[in-house]
């Protein structure tokens, strides 16, 4: 019988390089077991086929996981033209094969231009979006007819990295909720031949533009060699880099952590990250036009429990 894992309070962010073939939740649980972290969450699913950056939040850092979910992201996608699948990627069953037309790079640029900016995009039927309280993929696996939702998403940029028919490689920078599988599927229809994702790698997630990622194997090796968790975890404040910053003195920081509102005309308006005099994050707040700072998410126990 295997000994039970002794989990511990642990606060920080792990920039995991997710392997292909593993769901985001399974990747999270594997990292959580290795770190022996009591509480963890990821910041938005990567498809099992996809690799690359999956920020994992542990302990008090889970309170900002939803904020990272809404961040901009970038991907490298290899697309195969001429074949559609039921999942819109290589993990699915082929549905239809069509001849790939003679497409020049200029033709590609014209076609891709329609997908840049704010666009309406229909989610894949094999997705984690819920309908009637159930993920779409569960309905799809039962063979149910699904009317996947159409949502507005934003694509900031698409760069052609390479094209040799039938394979096309793109770099896509996009906002939250964008499905690269849907983009590939829809591009294939515009070109008249269909398409699916062959491989997908997430390069970065705001604010981690140049992430030093670690694999599960690398994490296991480092911990077995005696590395402390703080050498592989980023502090919570690393995830707050895009927020306006307010530093309070000890008395005001204590009041803020107790949930009290504060007022100062010098406070920047909007959502802010609040820090104590020692530089440790106290939480997130919202400042209105009158300079009133209202606590939104408070970080607890960071001074009492170190990342170790």
Swiss-Prot record:
EC identifiers of the protein: 5.4.99.25
Family from the record: Belongs to the pseudouridine synthase TruB family. Type 1 subfamily.
Residues the record marks as active site: 47 (nucleophile)
UniProt cross-references to PANTHER family, sorted A to Z: PSEUDOURIDYLATE SYNTHASE TRUB1 (PTHR13767:SF2), TRNA-PSEUDOURIDINE SYNTHASE (PTHR13767)
Reactions catalysed, as given in the entry: uridine(55) in tRNA = pseudouridine(55) in tRNA
Purpose of the protein: Responsible for synthesis of pseudouridine from uracil-55 in the psi GC loop of transfer RNAs.
SUPFAM superfamilies linked to this entry: Pseudouridine synthase, PUA domain-like
Entry keyword tRNA processing: yes
Species: Xanthomonas oryzae pv. oryzae (strain KACC10331 / KXO85)
The protein's name: tRNA pseudouridine synthase B
Pfam families attached to this UniProt entry: TruB-C_2, TruB_C_2, TruB_N
Keyword entries, A-Z: Isomerase, tRNA processing
Keyword tRNA processing among record annotations: yes
Upper classification of the organism: Bacteria, Pseudomonadati, Pseudomonadota, Gammaproteobacteria, Lysobacterales
Gene Ontology process terms (BP): mRNA pseudouridine synthesis; tRNA pseudouridine synthesis
Record InterPro entries: PsdUridine_synth_cat_dom_sf (IPR020103), PsdUridine_synth_N (IPR002501), PUA-like_sf (IPR015947), PUA_sf (IPR036974), tRNA_psdUridine_synth_TruB (IPR014780), tRNA_sdUridine_synth_fam1_C (IPR015240), TruB_C (IPR032819)
């Amino acid at each position: 019988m295997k000994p039970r894992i002794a989990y511990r309070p642990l606060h920080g962010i792990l920039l995991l390089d997710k392997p292909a073939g593993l769901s985001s939740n399974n990747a999270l649980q594997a990292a959580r077991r290795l770190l022996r972290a009591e509480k963890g969450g990821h910041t938005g699913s990567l498809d099992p086929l996809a690799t690359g950056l999956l920020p994992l939040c542990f302990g008090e850092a889970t309170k900002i996981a939803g904020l990272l979910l809404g961040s901009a992201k970038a991907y490298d996608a290899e697309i195969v033209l001429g074949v559609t699948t039921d999942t819109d990627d290589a993990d699915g069953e082929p549905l239809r094969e069509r001849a790939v037309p003679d497409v020049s790079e200029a033709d590609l640029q014209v076609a891709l231009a329609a997908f840049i900016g704010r666009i309406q995009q229909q989610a894949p039927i094999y997705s984690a979006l819920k309908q009637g309280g159930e993920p779409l993929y569960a309905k799809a696996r039962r063979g149910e007819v699904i009317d996947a939702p159409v949502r507005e998403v934003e694509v900031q940029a698409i760069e052609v990295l390479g094209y040799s028919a039938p394979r096309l490689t793109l770099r896509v920078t996009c906002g939250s909720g964008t499905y690269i599988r849907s983009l590939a599927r829809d591009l294939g229809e515009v070109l008249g031949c269909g398409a699916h994702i062959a491989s997908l790698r997430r390069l970065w997630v705001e604010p981690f533009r140049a992430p030093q990622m670690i694999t599960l194997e690398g994490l296991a090796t480092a911990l077995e060699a005696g590395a402390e968790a703080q050498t592989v975890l980023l502090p919570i404040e690393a995830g707050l880099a895009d927020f306006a910053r307010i530093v309070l003195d000890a008395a005001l920081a204590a009041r803020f952590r107790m949930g009290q509102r504060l007022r100062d005309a010098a406070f920047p308006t909007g959502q802010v990250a609040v820090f104590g005099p020692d530089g440790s994050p106290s939480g997130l707040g919202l400042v209105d036009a009158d300079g009133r700072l209202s606590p939104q998410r408070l970080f607890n126990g960071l001074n009492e429990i170190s990342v170790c």
